[in-house]
Amino acid sequence: MPTHLVWFRRDLRLQDNLALAAACRDASARVLALYISTPAQWQAHDMAPRQAAFISAQLNALQTALAEKGIPLLFHEVADFNASIETVKNVCRQHDVSHLFYNYQYEFNERQRDAAVEKTLPSVICEGFDDSVILAPGAVMTGNHEMYKVFTPFKNAWLKRLKEDIPPCVPAPKIRVSGALSTPLTPVSLNYPQQAFDAALFPVEENAVIAQLRQFCAQGADEYALRRDFPAVDGTSRLSASLATGGLSPRQCLHRLLAEQPQALDGGPGSVWLNELIWREFYRHLMTWYPALCKHQPFIRWTKRVAWQENPHYFQAWQKGETGYPIVDAAMRQLNATGWMHNRLRMITASFLVKDLLIDWRLGERYFMSQLIDGDLAANNGGWQWAASTGTDAAPYFRIFNPTTQGERFDRDGEFIRQWLPALRDIPGKAIHEPWRWAEKAGVVLDYPRPIVEHKQARIATLSAYEAARKGA
């Protein structure tokens, strides 16, 4: 009887899990599951404590779900990816594993680890799957067989390729012939700092996540284009955390969207949310093609020469939400308190750090990863490089958000700002976007800082720094 081992990583679900489905295809095989915790590696990768708590909860739910299918979950903890190579080898030897199944991860360290694992298992048949994307890296290329560097042509080619053959979702495995496990389960515990998260916003149980997806696609996807930019409105899917840890697959998102919004592939209702899924694909494909992106390197080489300011005071003010710009500060306090931030606010806060404070985007990238429950290297790096004008198809360097104008445009009446900045709750109407002006006129002393920089002057300094770097190219 063959023994099949499924190595779980960022794919913590039963439904539409390509590696798990392949491992369970042979009804006569004994199927085991493996998860390896690597705290030192996670620390090096700046994994957020809230994401660790989310993964821990998902693992325990996964262990229960697997047990009901008759599949035991083997849990091991080692320091880092290098140590995990030997762990996989030992598990395969101890359990006489004939086949190893896993879903690809596209980050540089993860790819090195997987290649090393396969080299240490010459007698084991290893099968990997492109599970975390809808179309595999390399499936969408230019006429010169190169990776697209601009999103819109990539999107058009991606949609054309998708329409030719939409990848199906695979069902959860059936219960094994041996039946469900009867032995009591030992709870999985991660030796990593953890912080509580809101399980109502970020459900753990697989069925609850699918219900969240169904509700959004049925009731929110068609109006997503109109509502997505306003942080006071519940207009986004909140599925990013489940996508980041693999509690949900992008194929599940695609199929549910098309079931509810069948015109999404042709620019109809739901197409704007589909665009966000394609951006996710774009950044993953880029990371596979350009591994330097995993090493904190800018895509546009001349931006390496930008003379960033080293100003710990400014950086800490940004981290704490004490910059004096209400929309920026409210957004950062939302991030610190919940581990999540609205996407429009991610753009605003990133732009402010880089182009108002002239602080290296990589510091912001790392801080976001250390806080985000939906931390994902490809998406986070892509977003930061877009905001910093260092990435492929990024905002041009001279595009600099005015933080006050952004607040007026996307939180006009200050509803979101008042939620997160209690010191400003009594400021009437639109005056909340420039509280220092209102305070001066009203003769009031606010428990809130004045702006740490003047935007117009900061804009001039940033343009000068970028232009100097570009001319040195």
UniProtKB/Swiss-Prot annotation:
Q: Which positions bind FAD? A: Y224, T236, S237, R238, L239, S240, D374, G375, D376
**Where on the tree of life does the source sit, at the highest rank?**
Bacteria
* Chain positions recorded as (6R)-5,10-methylene-5,6,7,8-tetrahydrofolate binding sites: N109, E110
Q: Where is this site: Electron transfer via tryptophanyl radical?
A: W308, W361, W384
> What is the reaction catalyzed?
cyclobutadipyrimidine (in DNA) = 2 pyrimidine residues (in DNA)
Documented EC number(s): 4.1.99.3
Q: What protein am I looking at?
A: Deoxyribodipyrimidine photo-lyase
Alphabetical list of Gene3D superfamilies matching this protein: 1.25.40.80, DNA Cyclobutane Dipyrimidine Photolyase, subunit A, domain 3 (1.10.579.10), HUPs (3.40.50.620)
Q: Where does DNA bind?
A: R228, Q406
**Subunit-structure text:** Monomer.
GO BP, sorted A to Z: DNA repair; response to light stimulus
